[in-house]
């Protein structure tokens, strides 16, 4: 027997079907695609540049983001998707004896990273209505990480409650994962200059429709960004490739396009939620680009299988006790969601 092998339960990602004709609503991707400037940047990209290593600091992308977000470039760190950003953050900030706190029902990678990096952690149960109770996060801890709006619930925690957490935990890092913030709620960005312990993470996968590129970033004050960069450069200083940086920069420069698409998604989410309620479903109040919903007059497993048979792919969590009777359904285009509603009506008979 070979000694020294790591035993770990990995993160389980959503299925990536190969069909050409389908409605894919299982991984919270953006149905509206890349902006005109991104398409132009791709068409004009000089392939000969790929013989060179990528830049170390992603200066162009950081400058574009800094201008967009009204922060300094030194307050930004770019990495290979927000998963990479968050993985770096776990290594950079969670080195205390006290446990890192996060909800029992949230982004599944948090527990995986904590186990992988041997970080002490405590999963705090969400309330019965799936909300996060601020008081649960005021005890001694080694750091806090919250997705806001949360996933897979889609529920948003108000900014005044986020500030309470920051104020009560000023000697540890509080990470707010804002992967879905463009679809509802208020960003914690306004708190950045007030709290040195705040780290905000974001991704280009959701609002910018660039999930296939793998680009994400952290926003924090310079001392924390410096620690993250030190960790990043100790693992892979070239983690963001040239093409990804160029296309992400073009996306930031064309941000009004994505803002309009986010409005479409919000409108479709409201309409779709209303249709589900009319059919007797429970629907959690989402501020993300998905809804978590529970049918009442048929088994969730049957609905999942019947939708899949129609090449409509949604997310089902049969092994997660608290949401085993729920489906998470990403928002497609309005036309796609109308097809989903028709399919559900057919399945219900």
Swiss-Prot record:
Q: Enzyme class, one word?
A: transferase
Q: A Pfam family for this UniProt protein?
A: Aminotran_1_2
Q: Which UniProt keywords apply?
A: Amino-acid biosynthesis, Aminotransferase, Histidine biosynthesis, Pyridoxal phosphate, Transferase
Task: Quickly give the catalysed reaction.
Answer: L-histidinol phosphate + 2-oxoglutarate = 3-(imidazol-4-yl)-2-oxopropyl phosphate + L-glutamate
Query: Which CDD domains does the entry link to?
Result: AAT_like
Q: Which GO terms describe its molecular function?
A: histidinol-phosphate transaminase activity; pyridoxal phosphate binding
The record's Gene3D superfamilies line, in alphabetical order, gives: Aspartate Aminotransferase, domain 1 (3.90.1150.10), Type I PLP-dependent aspartate aminotransferase-like (Major domain) (3.40.640.10)
Assembly behavior:
Homodimer.
Family indicated by similarity: Belongs to the class-II pyridoxal-phosphate-dependent aminotransferase family. Histidinol-phosphate aminotransferase subfamily.
Task: Give the protein's recorded name.
Answer: Histidinol-phosphate aminotransferase
Q: Which organism is it from?
A: Streptococcus mutans serotype c (strain ATCC 700610 / UA159)
Lineage from the top down?
A: Bacteria, Bacillati, Bacillota, Bacilli, Lactobacillales
């Amino acid at each position: 027997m070979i000694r020294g092998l790591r035993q770990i339960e990995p993160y389980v990602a959503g299925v990536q079907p190969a069909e050409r004709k389908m409605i894919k609503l299982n991984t919270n991707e953006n149905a509206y695609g890349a902006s005109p400037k991104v398409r132009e940047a791709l068409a004009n990209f000089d392939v000969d540049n790929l013989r060179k290593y990528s830049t170390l600091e992603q200066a162009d992308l950081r400058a574009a983001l800094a201008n967009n977000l009204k922060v300094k470039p030194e307050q930004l760190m770019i990495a290979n998707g927000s998963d990479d950003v968050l993985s770096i953050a776990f290594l950079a900030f969670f080195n205390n004896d006290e446990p890192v706190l996060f909800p029992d029902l949230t982004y599944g990678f948090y527990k995986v990273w904590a186990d992988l990096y041997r970080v002490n952690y405590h999963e705090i149960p969400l309330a019965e209505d799936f909300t996060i109770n601020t008081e649960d996060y005021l005890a001694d801890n080694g750091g806090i990480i919250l997705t806001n709006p949360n996933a897979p619930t889609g529920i948003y925690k108000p900014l005044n409650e986020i500030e309470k957490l920051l104020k009560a935990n000023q000697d540890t890092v509080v990470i707010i994962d804002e992967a879905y913030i463009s679809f509802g709620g208020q960003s914690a960005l306004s708190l950045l200059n007030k709290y040195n312990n705040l780290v905000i993470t974001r991704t280009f996968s959701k609002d910018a429709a660039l999930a296939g590129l793998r680009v994400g970033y952290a926003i924090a004050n310079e001392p924390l960004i410096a620690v993250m960069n030190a960790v990043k450069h100790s693992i892979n200083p070239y983690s963001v490739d040239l093409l990804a940086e160029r296309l992400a920069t073009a996306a930031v420069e064309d941000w009004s396009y994505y803002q309009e698409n986010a409005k479409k998604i919000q409108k479709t989410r409201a309409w779709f939620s209303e249709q589900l309620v009319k059919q007797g479903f429970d629907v959690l109040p989402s501020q993300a680009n998905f809804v978590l919903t529970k049918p009442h007059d048929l088994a969730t497993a049957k609905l999942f299988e019947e939708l899949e048979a129609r090449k409509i792919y949604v997310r089902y969590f049969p092994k997660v006790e608290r949401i085993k009777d729920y489906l998470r359904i990403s928002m497609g285009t309005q036309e796609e969601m109308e097809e989903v509603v028709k399919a559900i009506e057919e399945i219900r008979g």
